[in-house]
Structure formats: structure tokens, C-alpha cells
Amino acid sequence: MKIDYLTLFPEMFEGVLNHSILKRAQDKGIINVNTINFRDYSINKHNQVDDYPFGGGQGMVLKPEPVFNAMEDINRNEHTRVILMCPQGRPFTQEIAQELSEAKHIVFICGHYEGYDERIRKHLVTDEISMGDYVLTGGELPAMTMTDAIVRLIPGVLGNQASHQDDSFSDGLLEFPQYTRPREYKNMSVPEVLLSGNHAHIDQWRHEQKLIRTYEKRPDLLEQYPLTEKDREILETYKKKLKND
């Protein structure tokens, strides 16, 4: 996968891209990343990339020329996903991360200031993505977050490709509780079922815990999850237990 970042602050990406999973993915040749400072494509002698909005208003707006010019230097085709990081976009989810992990080329447009000239949005962008109902100073941090979520799903990136299959949201539920050694710590014990060696019982316990944890922390996710009759029984039993405690 090729990943290009159009940004005014390419140095922001150095720490994230040069460590951990993203660095290993580059070392393996699975991803090829490139940061492009679109200030270098300004047609203004002062390298200006923003201007006041027509019609008045607060803040500055990114000019179209630097972004369009930078995009012309990127070798892309009709399959390239050009992502605009903006609060108006569709909320980023694990499902979108999985979808984008199958792309061959992604371009992130990371803006600053008040916003973008609308012509950038209309004529260059294939996807508008939001990280949530809040506003950040620029698109760099969301682009880094998305990159991490996307790249770890590409085959060959993780040491054990099945590692992400139990992650929260991978099947629509939150992840089950995890334990490691020591078995006892400050009078807190690991659940006996995890020490039993009975993998069928362990799988059942983990699924029950995923249902319960999702009900406790993100009940909205259960509205979309295809609950079986057994799942409903598990949740009803848990609800009754809560009432009796």
C-alpha cells in the first residue's frame, strides 16, 4: 500500500511512522509512506496557502491552488482513495478501517485553519472522514490515527494475523477481559475458566464477557449486533443479577 500525506507539518508524522507496527510495515515493504508539504506548491511568492473567506467570516481558508498542484504530482488513478479529514465526514469505524486496508493507494489531505476551499472537497476528494463530534486544529492527528488502524489490518503486518480478530469492534462487540501472570495478585485472581485448559468453555466465557462488556459500556452496539437466543439469555441473566445485587 502507498500512503501519501498532504500536510503543512510533515515533521509531525516522523515519530508515529518511525516506531512500532508502522515502522515494521515499512521495513517489510508492505507500506510505502510519503509526506508532501503542499506549501511548496503555493503560487504566491510568500508561499501563502490560505486566504480570507469570500463573504466574510472568521478564520482563514485553505486556497485550492497548492492542494491541486500537489495532487497533480501524485501518481494516482481512479482507485486511489483521497481522504479529507474533516468534522463533516462520516465517523471513522473499524468497518471503514477494514475497507480501507484493502486499498492500494491512500492520500490523506490534512488541513489547518478554518477550513478548505469547497473546490478541493468537490473535485479531489473520494472520502470525507471524521474522528468524532469535536474539532481539532488540523488533520494530521486524525490521519495518523487512521493509518495505524488501517495498516494493522493488512495481511503480514502483525506477527499473528489473527491478533486483530478479537479486537474490540472486529465482530461488532467490545473485547473480552484479558489476564496474564501472576495468577494471584493483591488478592485478585484470574478467573478459573481461563486456567482450565477447556477451550470450548474458554471461548464461551469470552463471548459472554464480550456481550456483557458491550451492554455495560456501549449498549448502542447491540442494536446492530445479530443476537442469538442464547445471547439474549446471557444478557437477561446478567440484567437479573444486577437487579438482585
From Swiss-Prot:
The name this protein goes by in its record: tRNA (guanine-N(1)-)-methyltransferase
Any GO MF annotation of the entry: tRNA (guanine(37)-N1)-methyltransferase activity
Keywords per UniProt: Cytoplasm, Methyltransferase, S-adenosyl-L-methionine, Transferase, tRNA processing
Xref: NCBIfam families: PRK00026.1, trmD
Gene: trmD
One record GO biological process: tRNA N1-guanine methylation
Chief localization: cytoplasm
Catalysed reactions, semicolon-separated: guanosine(37) in tRNA + S-adenosyl-L-methionine = N(1)-methylguanosine(37) in tRNA + S-adenosyl-L-homocysteine + H(+)
Binding-site list for S-adenosyl-L-methionine: 111, 131-136
InterPro entries linked: Alpha/beta_knot_MTases, tRNA_m1G_MeTrfase_C_sf, tRNA_m1G_MeTrfase_TrmD, tRNA_m1G_MTases_N, tRNA_MeTrfase_TRMD/TRM10
Enzyme Commission numbers on file: 2.1.1.228
Self-association and partners: Homodimer.
Disulfide-bonded cysteines: none
Protein purpose: Specifically methylates guanosine-37 in various tRNAs.
Cellular component GO terms held in the UniProt record: cytosol
Cleaved signal peptide residues: none
Localization of this protein: Cytoplasm
Enzyme class, spelled out: transferase
Similarity comment text for this entry: Belongs to the RNA methyltransferase TrmD family.
